[in-house]
């Protein structure tokens, strides 16, 4: 789970 997941959410 990368930081990108935060943006996706």
UniProtKB/Swiss-Prot annotation:
Protein's organism: Ephedra distachya
Keyword annotations from UniProtKB, A to Z: Cell wall, Pathogenesis-related protein, Plant defense, Secreted
Single GO biological process annotation from the record: defense response
Main location per the UniProt record: secreted
Keyword Transit peptide among UniProt keywords: no
Keyword Secreted: yes
CC per GO annotation: extracellular region
Name of the protein in question: Pathogenesis-related protein
Localization terms from the record: Secreted, Cell wall
Domain Barwin: 1-9
Tree of life domain: Eukaryota
């Amino acid at each position: 789970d990368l930081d990108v997941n935060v943006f996706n959410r």
